[in-house]
Protein backbone atom coordinates (compact mmCIF):
# COMPACT_ATOMS: atom_id res chain seq x y z
CA UNK A 1 0.00 0.00 0.00
CA UNK A 2 1.24 3.52 -0.77
CA UNK A 3 0.85 4.41 2.88
CA UNK A 4 3.80 2.22 3.87
CA UNK A 5 1.91 -0.06 6.23
CA UNK A 6 3.86 -2.51 8.37
CA UNK A 7 2.87 -5.97 7.15
CA UNK A 8 3.83 -7.42 10.50
CA UNK A 9 1.36 -5.23 12.37
CA UNK A 10 -1.86 -6.00 10.44
CA UNK A 11 -4.68 -3.75 11.51
CA UNK A 12 -7.54 -6.18 11.40
CA UNK A 13 -7.65 -9.90 12.10
CA UNK A 14 -8.75 -12.21 9.32
CA UNK A 15 -11.75 -13.23 11.33
CA UNK A 16 -13.06 -9.67 11.66
CA UNK A 17 -13.64 -7.90 14.93
CA UNK A 18 -12.58 -4.64 13.27
CA UNK A 19 -14.31 -2.30 15.69
CA UNK A 20 -12.86 -3.92 18.79
CA UNK A 21 -9.39 -4.23 17.28
CA UNK A 22 -9.33 -0.52 16.49
CA UNK A 23 -10.81 0.62 19.75
CA UNK A 24 -8.24 -1.37 21.66
CA UNK A 25 -10.92 -3.27 23.57
CA UNK A 26 -12.34 -6.77 23.46
CA UNK A 27 -15.16 -8.65 25.04
CA UNK A 28 -13.96 -10.00 28.32
CA UNK A 29 -11.17 -7.46 28.74
CA UNK A 30 -11.10 -5.50 32.01
CA UNK A 31 -12.74 -2.10 31.75
CA UNK A 32 -9.48 -0.36 32.57
CA UNK A 33 -8.74 2.98 34.25
CA UNK A 34 -11.42 5.62 34.61
CA UNK A 35 -11.48 8.65 32.33
CA UNK A 36 -14.19 10.99 31.06
CA UNK A 37 -16.69 11.18 28.22
CA UNK A 38 -17.71 14.82 28.20
CA UNK A 39 -18.73 15.50 31.79
CA UNK A 40 -19.38 11.81 32.56
CA UNK A 41 -16.85 9.57 34.29
CA UNK A 42 -16.44 6.32 32.37
CA UNK A 43 -13.88 3.58 31.81
CA UNK A 44 -11.37 3.96 28.98
CA UNK A 45 -13.02 1.09 27.13
CA UNK A 46 -16.45 2.67 27.44
CA UNK A 47 -15.14 6.05 26.31
CA UNK A 48 -13.62 4.57 23.16
CA UNK A 49 -16.85 2.87 22.27
CA UNK A 50 -18.98 5.95 22.98
CA UNK A 51 -16.75 8.22 20.89
CA UNK A 52 -16.83 5.76 18.03
CA UNK A 53 -20.62 5.84 18.17
CA UNK A 54 -20.66 9.66 18.23
CA UNK A 55 -18.75 9.93 14.97
CA UNK A 56 -20.60 7.03 13.43
CA UNK A 57 -23.78 9.02 14.10
CA UNK A 58 -22.54 12.40 12.84
CA UNK A 59 -20.42 11.35 9.84
CA UNK A 60 -23.06 12.06 7.20
CA UNK A 61 -23.74 15.60 8.48
CA UNK A 62 -20.25 16.32 9.83
CA UNK A 63 -19.21 18.94 7.27
CA UNK A 64 -22.59 20.68 7.31
CA UNK A 65 -22.48 20.89 11.10
CA UNK A 66 -18.93 22.27 11.06
CA UNK A 67 -20.09 25.11 8.83
CA UNK A 68 -23.16 25.74 10.97
CA UNK A 69 -21.43 25.61 14.36
CA UNK A 70 -18.49 27.80 13.39
CA UNK A 71 -20.31 30.00 10.86
CA UNK A 72 -17.75 28.74 8.34
CA UNK A 73 -14.73 29.96 10.32
CA UNK A 74 -13.36 26.41 10.61
CA UNK A 75 -12.39 26.73 6.95
CA UNK A 76 -10.14 29.69 7.76
CA UNK A 77 -8.56 27.84 10.70
CA UNK A 78 -7.75 24.87 8.46
CA UNK A 79 -6.30 27.17 5.79
CA UNK A 80 -4.05 28.71 8.43
CA UNK A 81 -2.91 25.25 9.53
CA UNK A 82 -1.88 24.26 6.00
CA UNK A 83 -0.15 27.59 5.36
CA UNK A 84 1.72 27.13 8.63
CA UNK A 85 2.75 23.67 7.43
CA UNK A 86 3.98 25.23 4.15
CA UNK A 87 4.48 21.87 2.41
CA UNK A 88 6.68 21.59 -0.65
CA UNK A 89 6.40 19.09 -3.52
CA UNK A 90 7.55 15.68 -2.35
CA UNK A 91 6.12 16.06 1.17
CA UNK A 92 4.62 12.92 2.72
CA UNK A 93 1.80 13.80 5.13
CA UNK A 94 -0.25 11.66 7.48
CA UNK A 95 -3.47 13.32 8.59
CA UNK A 96 -4.74 11.45 11.63
CA UNK A 97 -8.43 11.66 12.52
CA UNK A 98 -8.64 13.07 8.99
CA UNK A 99 -12.18 11.84 8.48
CA UNK A 100 -13.82 13.81 5.71
CA UNK A 101 -10.57 14.98 4.14
CA UNK A 102 -10.58 18.73 4.80
CA UNK A 103 -6.86 18.91 5.63
CA UNK A 104 -5.87 16.42 2.94
CA UNK A 105 -7.63 18.34 0.18
CA UNK A 106 -6.10 21.62 1.31
CA UNK A 107 -2.66 19.99 1.38
CA UNK A 108 -3.05 18.71 -2.18
CA UNK A 109 -4.24 22.11 -3.42
CA UNK A 110 -1.35 23.86 -1.71
CA UNK A 111 1.31 21.51 -3.07
CA UNK A 112 -0.16 21.65 -6.56
CA UNK A 113 -0.05 25.46 -6.43
CA UNK A 114 3.58 25.47 -5.25
CA UNK A 115 4.51 22.99 -7.96
CA UNK A 116 2.88 25.15 -10.64
CA UNK A 117 4.76 28.26 -9.47
CA UNK A 118 8.04 26.34 -9.48
CA UNK A 119 7.37 25.16 -13.02
CA UNK A 120 6.60 28.67 -14.25
CA UNK A 121 9.79 30.02 -12.65
CA UNK A 122 11.82 27.22 -14.21
CA UNK A 123 10.44 27.95 -17.67
CA UNK A 124 11.20 31.66 -17.33
CA UNK A 125 14.83 30.77 -16.68
CA UNK A 126 14.99 28.79 -19.94
CA UNK A 127 14.04 31.50 -22.41
CA UNK A 128 16.94 30.48 -24.66
CA UNK A 129 15.21 27.16 -25.37
CA UNK A 130 13.06 26.62 -28.43
CA UNK A 131 9.31 26.58 -27.98
CA UNK A 132 9.35 22.83 -28.75
CA UNK A 133 11.81 22.20 -25.91
CA UNK A 134 9.84 24.43 -23.55
CA UNK A 135 6.61 22.64 -24.45
CA UNK A 136 8.19 19.21 -23.91
CA UNK A 137 9.64 20.24 -20.55
CA UNK A 138 6.32 21.73 -19.49
CA UNK A 139 4.36 18.60 -20.40
CA UNK A 140 6.84 16.37 -18.56
CA UNK A 141 6.59 18.48 -15.43
CA UNK A 142 2.80 18.73 -15.67
CA UNK A 143 2.56 14.93 -15.67
CA UNK A 144 3.60 15.02 -12.00
CA UNK A 145 1.60 17.97 -10.61
CA UNK A 146 2.17 17.01 -6.96
CA UNK A 147 5.90 16.43 -7.26
CA UNK A 148 5.50 12.98 -5.63
CA UNK A 149 3.67 14.42 -2.62
CA UNK A 150 1.27 12.08 -0.86
CA UNK A 151 -1.23 12.37 1.96
CA UNK A 152 -2.53 9.43 3.96
CA UNK A 153 -5.84 10.09 5.72
CA UNK A 154 -6.06 7.89 8.81
CA UNK A 155 -9.23 7.64 10.89
CA UNK A 156 -10.57 5.14 13.39
CA UNK A 157 -14.13 5.50 12.16
CA UNK A 158 -15.12 3.75 8.95
CA UNK A 159 -18.19 5.98 8.48
CA UNK A 160 -16.04 9.11 8.59
CA UNK A 161 -13.66 7.57 6.04
CA UNK A 162 -16.62 6.63 3.87
CA UNK A 163 -17.82 10.25 3.93
CA UNK A 164 -14.31 11.45 3.07
CA UNK A 165 -13.94 9.07 0.14
CA UNK A 166 -17.30 10.13 -1.25
CA UNK A 167 -16.34 13.78 -0.98
CA UNK A 168 -12.97 13.13 -2.65
CA UNK A 169 -14.70 11.43 -5.55
CA UNK A 170 -17.21 14.27 -5.87
CA UNK A 171 -14.47 16.93 -5.82
CA UNK A 172 -12.12 15.01 -8.12
CA UNK A 173 -9.32 14.16 -5.70
CA UNK A 174 -7.55 10.85 -6.26
CA UNK A 175 -3.88 11.28 -7.10
CA UNK A 176 -1.54 11.36 -4.10
CA UNK A 177 -4.36 10.45 -1.72
CA UNK A 178 -4.97 7.26 0.26
CA UNK A 179 -7.28 6.28 3.11
CA UNK A 180 -6.43 4.04 6.07
CA UNK A 181 -8.57 2.75 8.92
CA UNK A 182 -6.44 3.13 12.04
CA UNK A 183 -6.16 4.12 15.69
CA UNK A 184 -4.12 7.20 16.65
CA UNK A 185 -2.94 5.37 19.77
CA UNK A 186 -1.44 2.52 17.72
CA UNK A 187 -0.62 3.54 14.17
CA UNK A 188 0.28 0.75 11.77
CA UNK A 189 2.93 2.65 9.85
CA UNK A 190 6.70 2.18 9.76
CA UNK A 191 8.97 4.23 11.99
CA UNK A 192 10.38 7.46 10.50
CA UNK A 193 7.89 7.38 7.62
CA UNK A 194 6.29 10.83 7.28
CA UNK A 195 7.50 14.41 6.87
CA UNK A 196 4.46 15.93 8.56
CA UNK A 197 1.80 14.65 10.98
CA UNK A 198 -1.42 16.62 11.36
CA UNK A 199 -4.43 16.09 13.59
CA UNK A 200 -7.25 18.64 13.34
CA UNK A 201 -10.11 18.64 15.84
CA UNK A 202 -9.30 15.04 16.66
CA UNK A 203 -6.88 14.80 19.54
CA UNK A 204 -9.44 15.68 22.21
CA UNK A 205 -11.37 12.57 21.14
CA UNK A 206 -8.35 10.34 21.73
CA UNK A 207 -8.61 8.45 25.02
CA UNK A 208 -4.85 8.24 25.65
CA UNK A 209 -3.41 11.46 24.27
CA UNK A 210 0.04 10.50 25.55
CA UNK A 211 0.04 7.35 23.40
CA UNK A 212 -1.15 9.27 20.34
CA UNK A 213 1.67 11.79 20.76
CA UNK A 214 4.23 9.02 21.14
CA UNK A 215 2.94 7.42 17.95
CA UNK A 216 3.12 10.76 16.15
CA UNK A 217 6.75 11.06 17.18
CA UNK A 218 7.52 7.49 16.10
CA UNK A 219 6.11 7.72 12.57
CA UNK A 220 7.70 11.09 11.78
CA UNK A 221 11.07 11.26 10.08
CA UNK A 222 13.90 13.03 11.92
CA UNK A 223 13.23 16.68 11.21
CA UNK A 224 9.54 15.96 10.74
CA UNK A 225 6.84 18.28 12.04
CA UNK A 226 3.83 17.71 14.27
CA UNK A 227 0.85 20.06 13.87
CA UNK A 228 -2.33 19.95 15.94
CA UNK A 229 -5.38 22.17 15.40
CA UNK A 230 -7.82 21.92 18.27
CA UNK A 231 -10.43 23.80 20.25
CA UNK A 232 -8.78 25.31 23.30
CA UNK A 233 -9.33 27.76 26.15
CA UNK A 234 -10.47 31.33 25.51
CA UNK A 235 -8.28 33.98 27.13
CA UNK A 236 -10.78 36.87 27.10
CA UNK A 237 -13.22 36.55 30.09
CA UNK A 238 -16.13 38.27 28.33
CA UNK A 239 -15.67 36.26 25.14
CA UNK A 240 -15.34 33.11 27.24
CA UNK A 241 -18.77 33.67 28.81
CA UNK A 242 -20.38 34.38 25.44
CA UNK A 243 -18.65 31.34 23.95
CA UNK A 244 -19.95 29.11 26.74
CA UNK A 245 -23.46 30.44 26.23
CA UNK A 246 -23.30 29.77 22.50
CA UNK A 247 -21.69 26.35 22.95
CA UNK A 248 -24.13 24.94 25.48
CA UNK A 249 -27.33 26.67 24.38
CA UNK A 250 -26.98 26.76 20.59
CA UNK A 251 -24.69 23.98 19.33
CA UNK A 252 -26.72 21.03 20.72
CA UNK A 253 -29.86 22.60 19.25
CA UNK A 254 -28.16 22.86 15.86
CA UNK A 255 -27.14 19.23 16.23
CA UNK A 256 -30.75 18.24 16.80
CA UNK A 257 -32.15 20.37 13.98
CA UNK A 258 -29.52 19.60 11.32
CA UNK A 259 -28.26 16.14 12.25
CA UNK A 260 -31.09 14.87 14.45
CA UNK A 261 -28.57 14.24 17.23
CA UNK A 262 -28.56 16.40 20.36
CA UNK A 263 -26.46 14.05 22.50
CA UNK A 264 -23.47 13.80 20.16
CA UNK A 265 -23.10 17.56 19.95
CA UNK A 266 -23.64 17.95 23.67
CA UNK A 267 -20.65 15.61 24.08
CA UNK A 268 -18.57 17.60 21.59
CA UNK A 269 -19.18 20.79 23.57
CA UNK A 270 -18.37 19.10 26.87
CA UNK A 271 -15.24 17.51 25.41
CA UNK A 272 -13.90 20.96 24.52
CA UNK A 273 -14.32 22.12 28.12
CA UNK A 274 -12.55 19.02 29.46
CA UNK A 275 -9.62 19.36 27.04
CA UNK A 276 -6.27 20.50 28.49
CA UNK A 277 -5.41 24.21 28.14
CA UNK A 278 -2.73 25.37 25.74
CA UNK A 279 0.25 25.23 28.11
CA UNK A 280 -0.69 21.78 29.40
CA UNK A 281 -0.98 20.36 25.90
CA UNK A 282 2.35 21.97 25.02
CA UNK A 283 3.97 20.17 27.96
CA UNK A 284 2.43 16.86 26.85
CA UNK A 285 3.86 17.31 23.35
CA UNK A 286 7.28 18.02 24.83
CA UNK A 287 7.00 14.94 27.04
CA UNK A 288 6.52 12.86 23.89
CA UNK A 289 9.96 13.99 22.71
CA UNK A 290 9.16 16.92 20.44
CA UNK A 291 11.36 20.02 20.46
CA UNK A 292 10.75 23.67 19.55
CA UNK A 293 7.14 23.25 20.67
CA UNK A 294 4.95 26.33 20.51
CA UNK A 295 1.35 27.26 19.83
CA UNK A 296 -0.64 29.99 18.12
CA UNK A 297 -4.01 31.07 19.46
CA UNK A 298 -6.69 31.88 16.91
CA UNK A 299 -9.77 33.95 17.75
CA UNK A 300 -8.58 34.60 21.32
CA UNK A 301 -7.92 30.93 21.96
CA UNK A 302 -11.16 29.43 20.70
CA UNK A 303 -8.76 27.22 18.80
CA UNK A 304 -5.00 26.82 18.94
CA UNK A 305 -2.40 25.36 16.61
CA UNK A 306 0.37 23.48 18.40
CA UNK A 307 3.59 22.76 16.54
CA UNK A 308 6.62 20.64 17.36
CA UNK A 309 9.57 18.99 15.62
CA UNK A 310 11.23 15.61 15.84
CA UNK A 311 14.89 16.63 16.01
Swiss-Prot record:
Looking at the Swiss-Prot or TrEMBL record, what is one Pfam family this protein matches? Ubie_methyltran
Q: Does Methyltransferase appear among the keywords?
A: yes
Top-level enzyme category: transferase
Per the record, the major location class is mitochondrion
Q: Which reaction does it catalyse?
A: a 2-methoxy-6-(all-trans-polyprenyl)benzene-1,4-diol + S-adenosyl-L-methionine = a 5-methoxy-2-methyl-3-(all-trans-polyprenyl)benzene-1,4-diol + S-adenosyl-L-homocysteine + H(+)
Where S-adenosyl-L-methionine binds, per the record, is at 100, 155, 183-184
**Localization annotation:** Mitochondrion inner membrane
Named in its record, the pathway it takes part in is: Cofactor biosynthesis; ubiquinone biosynthesis
Q: Which SUPFAM superfamilies match?
A: S-adenosyl-L-methionine-dependent methyltransferases
Q: Which GO BP terms sit in this record?
A: methylation; ubiquinone biosynthetic process
Q: Name one GO molecular function term.
A: 2-methoxy-6-polyprenyl-1,4-benzoquinol methyltransferase activity
Q: Alphabetically list the UniProt keywords.
A: Membrane, Methyltransferase, Mitochondrion, Mitochondrion inner membrane, S-adenosyl-L-methionine, Transferase, Transit peptide, Ubiquinone biosynthesis
Record's bilayer topology term: Peripheral membrane protein
Domain of life where this protein originates: Eukaryota
Report the EC number(s), separated by commas if there are several: 2.1.1.201
Q: Name one GO cellular component term.
A: extrinsic component of mitochondrial inner membrane
What the entry lists under Gene3D superfamilies is as follows: Vaccinia Virus protein VP39
Organelle transit peptide residues: 1-29
Name the CDD domains for this protein.
Answer: AdoMet_MTases (cd02440)
Tell me, what does this protein do in biology? Methyltransferase required for the conversion of 2-polyprenyl-6-methoxy-1,4-benzoquinol (DDMQH2) to 2-polyprenyl-3-methyl-6-methoxy-1,4-benzoquinol (DMQH2).
Write down the PANTHER family for this protein, in alphabetical order: 2-METHOXY-6-POLYPRENYL-1,4-BENZOQUINOL METHYLASE, MITOCHONDRIAL, METHYLTRANSFERASE
Subunit structure as annotated in this protein's UniProt entry? Component of a multi-subunit COQ enzyme complex, composed of at least COQ3, COQ4, COQ5, COQ6, COQ7 and COQ9.
The record ties this protein, via HAMAP family, to: MenG_UbiE_methyltr
Q: Member of which family?
A: Belongs to the class I-like SAM-binding methyltransferase superfamily. MenG/UbiE family.
Record's protein name: 2-methoxy-6-polyprenyl-1,4-benzoquinol methylase, mitochondrial
This chain's source organism reads Gallus gallus
What gene name is listed for this protein?
A: COQ5
Amino acid sequence: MAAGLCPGRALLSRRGGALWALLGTARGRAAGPETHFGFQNVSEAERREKIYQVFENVAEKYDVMNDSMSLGIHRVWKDILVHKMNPSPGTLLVDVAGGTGDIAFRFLNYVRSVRERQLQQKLRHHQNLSWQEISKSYQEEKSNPLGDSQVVVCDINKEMLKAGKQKAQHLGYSEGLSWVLGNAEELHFDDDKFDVYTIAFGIRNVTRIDLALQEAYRVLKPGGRFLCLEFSHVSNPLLSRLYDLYSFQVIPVLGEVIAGDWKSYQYLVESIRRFPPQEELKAMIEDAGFLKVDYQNLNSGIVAIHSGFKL
